[in-house]
Amino acid sequence: MSTEGAYELFKKGSELLEAGDFMAASIPLERAAALEPDKSSIREALGRAYFRSARFEQAAEEFAALVERYPVNDYAHFCLGRSLEKTGRRAEARRHAALAANMRPDRKDYQAFRDRLQTA
């Protein structure tokens, strides 16, 4: 039985995420999230791993948890919007895309995503 702590699991998952092994990254990140469910860095990394492995519903759940806990986290709103769009929930996605774009008008990627959703 492993005695790895949340930080070690987060570090391992982050390394796998950066290496492009998204499915494998979710395993230690899920374990880290179970140990530290309120750690935003772990939840964000897990959401990214789910999104990049096309597990969009699970990604949306992670980013929604971040938004609930940290409503001014522009990146969480942006990622939640992207995840919701991939699940076909465009109306919900528009709301989060608009929030992210309004929070960070300097982010051209946020603006482009918001504009694309508004015209679709």
Language-model features and meaning:
Residues 74, 82-109, 115:
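TPR/TPR-like (Sel1-like) alpha-helical repeat modules
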Residues 19-30, 53-65, 87-99:
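Structural signature of tandem alpha-helical TPR/SEL1-like repeats
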Residues 3-35:
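Alpha-helical segment of the N-proximal tetratricopeptide repeat
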